[in-house]
Amino acid sequence: MVSFDATEALAPYREGRGYGAILFDRERLRQADASLFSPQSWGDRARPVDAGGRGGAWFVDAPFGHSVLRQYLRGGMAARVSRDRYLWKGAGRTRSFAEFRLMRELIKRKLPVPRPLAACYLREGVGYRAALLMERLENVRSLADHAQVAGRGAPWEATGQLIARFHRAGLDHADLNAHNILFDAGGHGWLIDFDRGVLRIPATRWRERNLKRLHRSLLKLRGNRSREDVDKDYARLHRAYELAWGRGY
């Protein structure tokens, strides 16, 4: 369960035929409006993110610091129905508000995640659109990048230890792939993209599901490397994970 946070602020707004709300960190933002979530409003201070994901993300040079703006987009078969609209089930269950609050809870638990700054939804009828603004992690590279460039020299053991920390805290990451694991120049690891993530009682089934998803993503990214090489790298990651899990950190 995600606890209540007194530093959150809520600002309702209207746009066209819809109405919505913005949830924001009042320690970082004095006020918030819908323009925060429009890349057009940022002009040349916003540029598209071209690594991983399905688009809909921008690096933003904002007055309150370097940030990432992400609009929620659907993938797969669901995108044929609507690219950016989700079924309304209540404000607290919007993708943006849920991810904002989950990230803040993970930070409270001393886990390395980017700080969320603001989240919004705009409801029109039975559907809504949503977006999230968060701090940008500077000078980081994804595990996907490390794996393609360094291969065996990528931080496999550090990745296993990092995932074990999050699993110990109960995080079930809905999309644990090599693009969502980042390392800075000092070797410190971070996780990103907590859309549809939840906190659970640690259990083998969902932990292994997360790890298998990561393994599949590494296989997809292997390029000219053999499956055997990728499996060996993943085995190193998994051994480090099991050791860290067994130690309790």
Curated annotation (Swiss-Prot):
<keyword id="KW-0448">Lipopolysaccharide biosynthesis</keyword>
<keyword id="KW-0418">Kinase</keyword>
<dbReference type="GO" id="GO:0005886">
    <property type="term" value="C:plasma membrane"/>
</dbReference>
<dbReference type="GO" id="GO:0016301">
    <property type="term" value="F:kinase activity"/>
</dbReference>
<dbReference type="GO" id="GO:0009244">
    <property type="term" value="P:lipopolysaccharide core region biosynthetic process"/>
</dbReference>
<dbReference type="Pfam" id="PF06293">
    <property type="entry name" value="Kdo"/>
</dbReference>
<dbReference type="InterPro" id="IPR022826">
    <property type="entry name" value="KDO_kinase"/>
</dbReference>
<dbReference type="GO" id="GO:0016773">
    <property type="term" value="F:phosphotransferase activity, alcohol group as acceptor"/>
</dbReference>
<comment type="function">
    <text>Catalyzes the ATP-dependent phosphorylation of the 3-deoxy-D-manno-octulosonic acid (Kdo) residue in Kdo-lipid IV(A) at the 4-OH position.</text>
</comment>
<protein>
    <recommendedName>
        <fullName>3-deoxy-D-manno-octulosonic acid kinase</fullName>
        <ecNumber>2.7.1.166</ecNumber>
    </recommendedName>
</protein>
<keyword id="KW-0997">Cell inner membrane</keyword>
<comment type="similarity">
    <text>Belongs to the protein kinase superfamily. KdkA/RfaP family.</text>
</comment>
<keyword id="KW-0547">Nucleotide-binding</keyword>
<keyword id="KW-0472">Membrane</keyword>
<comment type="pathway">
    <text>Bacterial outer membrane biogenesis; LPS core biosynthesis.</text>
</comment>
<dbReference type="GO" id="GO:0005524">
    <property type="term" value="F:ATP binding"/>
</dbReference>
<keyword id="KW-0067">ATP-binding</keyword>
<keyword id="KW-1003">Cell membrane</keyword>
<keyword id="KW-0808">Transferase</keyword>
<feature type="active site">
    <location>
        <position position="175"/>
    </location>
</feature>
<dbReference type="InterPro" id="IPR011009">
    <property type="entry name" value="Kinase-like_dom_sf"/>
</dbReference>
